[in-house]
Amino acid sequence: MPPPAAKPTAPSPLQPGDAFGEAITLPERTIVYIKGYSKWDSAFDTLVDAFKSLREYLDKQDVKPAGPAITIYTQTDDAGFSFQAALPVAQAPKDPPKGDIAVGQAPSGRALKFVHRGSYDAMDSTYEAITNYLDDKQLEAKDLFIEEYATDPVNTAPDKLVVNVFVPVK
């Protein structure tokens, strides 16, 4: 789980209908992704750059994304995190990707959905609330978290972001 950001800011308040701990099933879906690592202070810029690279690749392949951008956090610590920045696709591109880009499957199965509104710098407050929720409900998360960007992280003003956070549970 991401640690606190350098500059704590409050997330925007949830709106009626926003999920907070809603049980869902993540569907199986094919993704085109880039693996990477980032320090926390450059997290958002690193992810935006990864999404731009993925879009350039898909544009060259004449493939349209089949859903919003996602980040799969595969490992975190106080210094930074390992991730897969991904775009879902209806089918894998005809020409296999080369270099840093790969095709695979997004995590699927039972998860809890939470909504974050506002700056990416304020995500620490959302993750703290998620941790408290899991503790209160005595639920154990798997070793990954998924962020799905309901608003386009490349083109949306930072304080207007809407991020669905999915927590796969054991």
Name each region found by the language model.
Residues 1-170:
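A solvent-exposed interaction/effector surface
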